[in-house]
A protein has these predicted regions:
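Regulatory and partner-binding modules of innate immune sensors/adaptors
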Residues: 45, 97-194, 200-204, 295, ...
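Membrane-inserting effector segments that mediate pore formation, membrane fusion
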Residues: 1-29, 100-101
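Cross-kingdom leucine-rich repeat
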Residues: 257-259, 265, 288-289, 503-522, ...
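Non-catalytic, charged helical/coil tracts that couple and regulate nucleotide-powered enzyme cores
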Residues: 20-23, 28, 45-62, 234-246, ...
Length: 928
């Protein structure tokens, strides 16, 4: 049986089995009879767990199977809750001395014995139903009606009826034929979310260029392909016949290679899901040097890369823009692009916003509206807009869309399905941070390790189940979004599994769209917009809720004392009128693992958290929190501590040896810096420093002991020169180093050891040619900010210039260079991936420059160039920090404003250089 953690389908059976085993240990001192019952429970639940996993792999379950699955899953939750309460009662009793502690233990044992009896009866009932109805014998035998494949219609759609196809069609043809005279086999992979029109695009391109080839074929592969049939279909297309004796993969591959040996062919392989399928298919694609072409379509990024890894390209299909979406939508409903009644325009735009440019979604919803007896009914249109998830579940007109969404979901592993469903917790259109999601998944028990959770996030991106929202400075995905239709699908699935409950304005107890039957709420997402919605929960039981997520006015937040067994607590509050609300109750939430609070004052709460022994992640955002935080009030096993930068940290930080993330605290006590060296597991460190020489003496020794550090960011008061110059050896896994307030005389020698460094922000006194060469050796760099206060003179030529030679900085995408004059020179081949260039300079020093952005035309990927020109030299120097006014390395000190002529001269020189660029990057020149 595959190992599962907490799962949407199986509930908490996996951790439950471990806890039942733990109860048998001597320290709990249970009676022999109770231990016997626990062993029996464990055996029964283990058998049920195996069947639940089997059921989870079955696409269609009958009602009997679904009902049994739901009851066993809910039973597992109830059993784990019982054990957790018992263990906490024993811990509380241990904390009491003498007779009182003994009585508490006796009471706890009595309660667990009674509860075990009750649970055993329920388990035996479930086991009896399993045996009586022989549920495992029917697994896989039930099958719903075959879903219509929307790709079939895509193959026979007339080009004249398509919208927004011309530009992607031309681009795909360009990629296919860009090396028309090249004899090698050329593969272009089209990749994108389900329903984006990949099949339609591939078919249109196939039809447009097929006359240029000797033979063509168009075949579909699908999720669970019969590769003999796929190969037969290819052979049928290029040869016209398939003898019956060719019925094995190897025979078909050999015949295809023979047929294609001397032909220029065009083959479209549609809907590939695995690299294994591609690896077999490509064996039949003869590399005959006749200029053959292959188009593949897939939802999965890795598969697209594998298909086009040699002599090929990946084309990521884009959603329709607003205009084309509207044209397609209105044409399907009203048979005209201009016939939509004025009264429906706003709701039409609202529906299209949910579709987000996905053609299949637009056509599916349009068909639903077009087939309604009152096509112009505003009430019906608004109902579709507001309750699309319900329509998705039951309306035949949306069968295509439901099928496409379910294909991607059903392809996920059990763990990935759970992680995917969890995204429905967040409000619509949320930008979801990866690091936050990773911490939540671990806290919920879906994943054991954060590294595994990060790989799951990447896999969901790779499979196009979620959309990238933003990248960080290192070029890694920082956040994601969920397509509105996918969110509706997730909410529908989660309701089926009673995985989470979302409520917005209407009471939960009256909202059948978010709860299933009489099952208890396990994860609750409360999303409110105004203070009139403060009774939506009514009298619903909340003690068993494992995850509570709140977005809304503080007055609407329920009492936290009602959430006895909560593990994950997220409070995003606005319009708060009170100081503390019910925050002191948090200290009694003994299972709390993740706590994030935004918009509330937490001064008193932060003094009461040391009893939360399971707490791993604590994040406080905003809320006017300031003052001091003594680390002795924090749980010693905390992994992540993120607090506002105006909250001062003090105490023995070294006792928190499990800490992995420490973000943003205000540091004025040198003891904190000295204690950092004990945090051997620390990976991300971001400090707001305020100190003098004692800080400089304490910081480096501690950093030298942090071997696991991945990211270091310092902010605040500028420290002395070269306080980090002797950081030897630096942590070899470091990928971010942002130390603008720790200036260096020159580029330190140790920086060449940082092979994984992707983001670097530093301040220098001098940048000679050797310094540029040292920085260029960091081939992984994606983001670079360089602020030079002194001299950049080339000692060999005496020119004031920084030359970036060919092949330097191969992966750099963002560069900020601050020096008195924009004296960068780019040779051909330098910075081939640079997209954004920002220059900060001073108009008064313009006469010193020997070159102004010379060779900028060689930056082939440049998209945007920003130039900040300071009229006042002292204002320019102040941007460097408290040592900026100290003259070093031949610096010039200017006190007067630069003449208008100098400013205009520099603007003209910069504009002239940038205008040479053939790619016409966007240009912004700002004067300060």
């Amino acid at each position: 049986m595959e190992r599962v953690m907490v799962s949407a389908v199986t509930g908490v059976i996996s951790p439950l089995l471990r806890k039942l085993t733990a109860l048998l240990e001597k320290k709990y001192k249970l009676s022999k009879d109770v231990k016997k019952e626990i062993t029996s429970l464990k055996d029964e639940m283990s058998s049920m767990s195996a069947l639940l996993v089997t059921l989870s792999r079955t696409e269609e379950l009958d009602e009997q199977q679904k009902d049994w699955r739901d009851k066993v899953r809910e039973l597992s939750y109830g059993m784990e809750d019982c054990i957790d309460i018992f263990m906490n009662d024993l811990d509380s009793a241990d904390a009491k001395a003498g007779l009182l502690g003994g009585l508490k233990k006796l009471k706890a044992h009595y309660k667990i014995a009674n509860r075990i009896e009750e649970l055993k009866a329920k388990v035996l009932e479930a086991s009896d139903r399993h045996n009586r109805y022989k549920l495992d014998e029917h697994v896989g035998s039930s099958r719903g009606p075959e879903a219509i494949d929307p790709r079939v219609q895509a193959l026979y759609t007339e080009a004249s009826s398509l919208v927004g196809i011309d530009r992607p069609k031309d681009k795909l043809i360009e990629l296919l034929m860009m090396e028309e005279n090249a004899p090698q086999l050329h593969v272009v992979s089209v990749v994108g979310f389900g329903g984006m029109g990949k099949t339609t695009l591939a078919k249109q391109v196939h039809d447009k260029i097929k006359s240029q080839f000797d033979c063509t074929a168009f075949v579909s592969v699908s999720q669970n392909p019969n590769l003999v049939k796929v190969l037969s279909d290819i052979l049928s297309g290029v040869w016209g016949q398939v003898p019956s004796f060719l019925n094995e993969e190897r025979q078909l591959i050999d015949k295809l290679r023979e047929v294609l040996q001397n032909k220029r062919y065009l083959i479209v392989i549609d809907d590939i899901w695995t690299m294994e399928a591609w690896n077999i298919i490509k064996c039949s694609l003869m590399e005959n040097n006749h200029g053959s072409r292959v188009i593949t379509t897939t939802r999965i990024e890795d598969v697209a890369q594998a298909c086009s890894c040699s002599h090929g390209h990946v084309y990521k299909i884009k959603p329709l823009n607003d205009l084309d979406s509207r044209r397609l939508f209105h044409r399907r409903i009203f048979h005209s692009e201009d016939a939509c009644p004025e009264k429906l325009m706003n709701v039409s735009d609202g529906i299209l916003k949910k579709c987000q440019g996905v053609p299949l979604a637009i056509l599916s919803v349009a068909s639903l509206l077009a087939n309604h007896k009152e096509v112009n009914s505003k009430y019906f249109w608004e109902m579709i807009q507001n309750y699309l998830s319900l329509q998705l579940e039951g309306n035949p007109a949306l069968q295509w869309m439901r099928h496409v969404l379910n294909l991607g979901y059903s392809y996920l592993s059990l763990d990935l399905k759970t992680c995917m469903l969890y995204l429905g917790i967040f409000p619509e259109d949320s930008e979801i941070r990866k690091d936050d999601l990773v911490k939540r998944w671990v806290a919920e028990g879906f994943v054991g390790l954060e590294e595994m959770a990060e790989s799951y996030f990447s896999e969901l991106i790779n499979k196009n189940m979620i959309q990238i929202a933003r990248f960080d400075d290192c070029g890694n995905v920082m956040s994601c979004r969920v397509h509105d239709l996918m969110l509706d699908f997730i909410i529908q699935k989660s309701t089926e599994e009673n995985f989470f409950t979302v409520t917005k304005e209407s009471p939960v107890i009256h909202d059948p769209h978010t709860m299933k039957g009489s099952m208890e709420v396990r994860r609750l997402s409360l999303q409110l917009r105004n203070t009139e919605c403060n009774h939506v929960l009514g009298n619903i039981a909340l003690a068993q809720v494992r995850s509570f997520n709140f977005w809304g006015p503080g007055q609407c937040m329920p009492s936290l004392s009602r959430f006895q067994l909560v593990r994950v607590l997220h409070l995003d509050v606005y319009d708060s009128k009170e100081e503390q609300y019910d925050l002191p109750s948090v200290r009694s939430l003994f299972l709390l693992t993740y706590l994030r609070i935004r918009g509330l004052k937490c001064d008193e709460l932060l003094k009461q958290l040391q009893t939360l022994k399971h707490l791993k992640s604590l994040e406080i955002v905003g809320g006017g929190n300031r003052g001091e935080l003594d680390v002795r009030y924090l749980p010693s096993m905390l992994w992540h501590l993120i607090v506002p930068k105006n909250l001062t940290l003090f105490g023995e930080i070294g006792r928190m040896e499990a800490l992995r993330t420490l973000h943003q605290p205000f540091i004025i006590h040198v003891e904190i810096l000295k204690g950092l060296g004990n945090l051997k597991n620390l990976r991300e460190l971001k400090l707001n420093l305020f100190g003098f020489s004692d800080f400089e003496d304490a910081l480096l020794p501690s950093l030298c002991r942090l071997d696991s550090l991945r990211s270091l960011t310092t902010d605040g008061y500028t420290l002395g020169y070269d306080c980090l110059a002797c950081w030897i050896p630096p942590p070899r896994h470091l990928h971010r180093l942002c130390v603008l307030n720790c200036p260096f005389s020159v580029v330190p020698d140790w920086i060449v050891q940082l092979e994984n460094l992707k983001s670097l922000e530093m301040q220098l006194v001098s940048l000679p040619r050797v310094g540029v060469e040292v920085l260029a050796s960091l081939t992984s760099l994606v983001h670079l900010i360089l602020r030079v206060k002194g001299n950049v003179r080339d000692h060999a030529t005496e020119d004031v210039v920084v030359v970036v030679r060919g092949a330097m900085f191969p992966n750099l995408k963002n560069l900020v260079f601050a020096y008195e004059v924009p004296c960068l020179t780019f040779e051909a081949g330098a910075m081939p991936r640079l997209q954004n260039l920002t220059i900060e300079c001073c108009a008064q020093a313009v006469g010193q420059a020997d070159a102004v952005l010379d060779g900028i035309e060689h930056l082939g990927s440049l998209r945007a160039c920003k130039v900040h020109i300071y009229k006042w030299a002292n204002l320019f120097r102040e941007s460097f920090g408290r040592f900026a006014a100290v003259a070093q390395g031949g610096e010039h000190v200017f006190q007067e404003e630069a003449p208008h002529m100098q400013v205009q001269s520099l603007r003209a020189a910069v504009s002239k250089a940038i205008n040479k660029h053939p790619g016409n990057p966007s240009v912004t020149i700002v004067t300060f």
